Amino acid sequence: MNKLRENKIAGSFEKFDDDEFYKISNIQEMPPFFINLASNSDIWMYLSSNGSLTAGRKNASFAVFPYETDDKIHIDSFTGPKTIIRITENGQIKLWEPFDKSVVNPYKFTRNLYKNIWGNALVYEEINHTLNVSFKYKWENSEKFGLVRTSCIVITS
């Protein structure tokens, strides 16, 4: 369980990747909420603040991930990305799964969510204070490539 309860939910504007984003800090302290991404093509994407999603082209019949109601998307851990990071610290191997939805999480962490001001990019960030590492991933859409996910790992110590 996360032990950084003194951190409060807050909102602010931040610039990175040549774009301006609205940041919601400490989303782990909030119940999951639904977000959509704007698109200038036939791509649609609905995401939960916990990382689950549904997306596709044209309509629900062309869904890439199962098209479900928001309550089901919030609880499903099988719709969306999964990342497992192996870290060796002092000769000991540790596994970290950012945005793990399980109740038991052995690490102290902070989760932040960023949406750009155009509404067509969404960034998830988890900072692992125990292992001194952070993980970010961004969802965008592209008429040529479809749904695009990029990710980044940063050592914070």
Segments predicted by a language model, with ranges:
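Anionic coordination/interaction segments
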Residues: 1-157
